[in-house]
Design a protein with these regions (language model features):
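Charged C-terminal helix
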Residues: 282-325
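Short pre-catalytic strand/loop immediately N-terminal to key active-site residues, enriched for Gly-Thr
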Residues: 50-51, 249-262
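Conserved phosphate/ATP/ADP-binding segment of small-molecule kinases
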Residues: 156-248, 279
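Short, small-residue alpha-helix embedded
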Residues: 258-281
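Phosphate-handling active-site elements
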Residues: 69, 248-249, 274-288
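Conserved N-terminal subdomain of the carbohydrate kinase-like
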Residues: 40-155, 309-324
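Short, Lys/Arg-enriched N-terminal segments with co-localized hydrophobic residues
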Residues: 15-38
């Protein structure tokens, strides 16, 4: 990496954007390589939380770093994610029809649509309408079906939400449920997790569920089950299980025995950005795993409360470099 001085500011320049002669660049020459590629756009349907480094506050910087314009559709505004002892939430369901209508009148087009936290069945219906209106032949649809974790459904979960999520995920090109959400989508009892006596049992359940969900879709779909925790005393790891057109495989990352806000949103955002750029799902999972491992490891050193999220910002530069190799 070298640094170029523009007036009184110093900008780090990755080797991939630096001319062979490594000369000091002017503004025009510095940014001209980036303009060779048309900017991709992703509509991100998610909540906006003031604290917690999750949802849109995770998606916007990650997609921007990956060279994808993030066009937010806020489903709710929260003072902080729901893990805080005190928070206020404003549901934006009533606003969404006018918001989406304005985008339609402005002839908006998207290379990707990424759906995350939705407040209920009515919002899912609105998202399905959004997809019908804006999805084109080339548009990637990624759905993160937020419903629960660690064997338990979230407080806002309802049967109507589950039925809507089933319909929504069937339309997606990529889905990123955790194992609890995957079991809900596949109609496997939540307590199935409790019957897994060994890590082998847990991984087999995750792989079986991934394949079952993949077969439900009427088109090629990549199912990525995130955050499968294997707490082996000698070698604790966390797996992301992927069922793709190339088969099923496991990606292993270091296991940190703490839970942090926003890690699933960061993972899904990296997948969305990478896949929108044409990177295959398997490689995108590797990049997301590396990015999260570094971010969580750094956060652990500072003893940051889990509800505050992870220190991902300082590792965006590495994500940029890795995604352009």
């Amino acid at each position: 990496m070298i640094f170029c001085r523009l007036d009184l500011y110093f900008f780090p320049i990755l080797d991939i954007y630096t001319p062979i002669d490594r000369t000091i660049l002017g503004y025009k020459e510095l940014f001209s390589p980036i303009r060779r590629f048309s900017m991709k756009k992703a509509a991100v349907i998610h909540d906006l939380s003031g604290f917690g480094k999750c949802s849109l506050t995770a998606a916007i910087p990650v997609l921007s770093a990956l060279g994808v314009q993030c066009c937010p559709v806020a489903t709710a505004v929260l003072t902080g994610q729901t893990g805080y002892p005190c928070y206020h939430c404003t549901d934006l369901t009533a606003m969404l029809p006018d918001y989406i209508d304005a985008w339609g009148k402005n002839n908006a087009h998207f290379d990707a649509i990424y759906s995350g936290f939705l407040t209920g069945a009515k919002q899912i219906s609105q998202v399905l309408d959004f997809i019908r209106q804006f999805r084109e032949e080339h548009t990637l649809l990624l759905v993160d079906p937020v419903m629960g974790d660690d064997g338990n459904a979230y407080p806002f979960f309802t049967p109507g939400l589950l039925n809507g999520m089933k319909e929504l995920t069937l339309k997606a090109d990529v889905i990123t449920p955790n194992l609890t959400e995957a079991c809900l989508l596949a109609d496997i009892p939540e307590d199935a997790l409790l019957h897994c006596r060994t890590n082998t049992d847990l991984l087999k359940l995750a792989e079986d569920v991934a394949l079952r969900l993949q077969k439900k879709a009427s088109h090629p779909q990549d199912v990525v089950i995130t955050g499968v925790k294997c707490r082996d005393e000698k070698h604790p790891v966390i797996y992301n299980i992927a069922a793709t057109a190339n088969g099923i495989y496991r990606h292993e990352s270091p296991f940190f025995d703490r839970s942090f806000s926003g890690t699933g949103d960061l993972f899904a955002s990296v997948l969305c950005g990478c896949c929108t750029k044409g990177i295959c799902t398997e490689d995108a999972i590797l990049l997301a795993g590396k990015f999260l491992s570094h971010s969580i490891g750094d956060t652990m050193k500072e003893n940051t409360p889990g509800r505050d999220g992870v220190n991902f910002e300082k590792f965006l530069i590495d994500l940029i470099a890795d995604s352009n190799v």
